[in-house]
C-alpha cells in the first residue's frame, strides 16, 4: 500500500491536517511545540482508493534534547521510506529558518514532495508570503485550512493523482486483525515490550517516564496470524496530572485506544508489585468490556517464584482471576511466545459464541446449583447469548428488581464453570423481567 508522510517544522498544523485527512481525532493537537513525539499512522480512504498516512514530529534544526533528536531521526527515516511527502508550511506566519532547514533535508532525500500551505483562510496574506514559500524549491503546492477543512478534497485529489503518476498502488483492506493495546503506568516497560514484540525500533524508548504521548500502532504477523499492536502513553493517577496539559490529552487518547481495542495488555512492573493505579487501570479495561492479559514485565529483576507472584496478584486483584498472567522481560525478550498464546486465547474467548443448549442446561440446573437465588424468590427462566466482543447474555427472570450485583457475579461464575471458561474476557449480564 502507498505511504504518504507529513513533514514540517513544529506548530504548522501537521497533526490537525492528519486528523482531518483520516477523518477522526487520533493525533494530539495543541499550540505547544513538539506535541507529536511518535509517528502516528492512519488509513485514508478516498474515492475508492486508499493509502497509509503518517504524521511525524516537528523537525527542529538545532536541539540537544535526546528525545527530540531521536524523533527527528525517526522522522527522517519515515521521509526516506515514503512514496509521497506532504511538506506543510504556515501560510499565515510565513517562512522561517526551520522551514528552510526542512526543505533542505527533503531535497537531499529526493522524494516526490507536495507542499501544503496550511492556515490559508486569508488568501491575501498567503499571496504576500508566496514568493518566499516558492523559494523553498518545490513546484507542486496547494493552499488549505486543516482547521476549517478548506480545500481538503482538492488536496486528496492531488495526493491520489501524484501516487498514480508514480505508479504506486493504493488499495482497500479490511481491518479484521485483532487490535492489541499495551497500557500501564509510566515506565513499566510498555514501549520496550512493544519494540520487543515488533523486533524493531518503532516507538521511542528512553528512561524518561511519559516518552510515548500519542498511541503508536503497527501491524505484526506471527505464525501466519496478523495483529495490530498499539503502544500508549503511561497512565498516572488523576491527582498527579495537571489539567489542560499534553499529558491529560495523552491519557484521553489512551482511554480511547482501550475502548477501541480487542485485547488490552496490562503491563505491571514486577519490581514494584501491584499498586492502586494498576488496579484502577485493570478496572477501567474490564469495565470498558475489553479482553485482558496481565503482563508482569521486568520479571528477570526479581527473585520470586511465578506461582507465588501469581497467587499474590490474584489476592490483590481477585476481580481479574479469569485473566491469563504472563511473565516477561522485554529487554531480554523472554516470555513473548507465551504472551502471544495468551493474546490468542483471550481474543478467541472475546469472540466466542456458545451453543444455546449449554445455556439452557445451565438455566435448568441453577435452582440446585445456587439455592441462595431461590431463597430470594428469584426465578431464572432462560439464558441466551446475544452478542460477542465481549460475550453478552440476556437472562430472563420473574422480577428484575430481585437481582443485584451479587446475582450478576454468581451467574458469571456459573457460566465460566459450567459452560465455558471465557479466559481473558469479561462477561456482560443483562437481566430482563418476563412479561
Curated annotation (Swiss-Prot):
InterPro entries reported for this sequence: G_ENGA (IPR031166), GTP-bd (IPR006073), GTPase_Der (IPR016484), KH_dom-like (IPR032859), KH_dom-like_a/b (IPR015946), P-loop_NTPase (IPR027417), Small_GTP-bd (IPR005225)
Keywords in alphabetical order: GTP-binding, Nucleotide-binding, Repeat, Ribosome biogenesis
Entry binding sites for GTP 1: 8-15, 55-59, 118-121
Domain named EngA-type G: residues: 2-167, 178-351
GO molecular function: GTP binding; ribosome binding
Family: Belongs to the TRAFAC class TrmE-Era-EngA-EngB-Septin-like GTPase superfamily. EngA (Der) GTPase family.
PANTHER family, A to Z: GTPASE DER
Function: GTPase that plays an essential role in the late steps of ribosome biogenesis.
Protein name: GTPase Der
Lineage: Bacteria, Thermotogati, Thermotogota, Thermotogae, Thermotogales
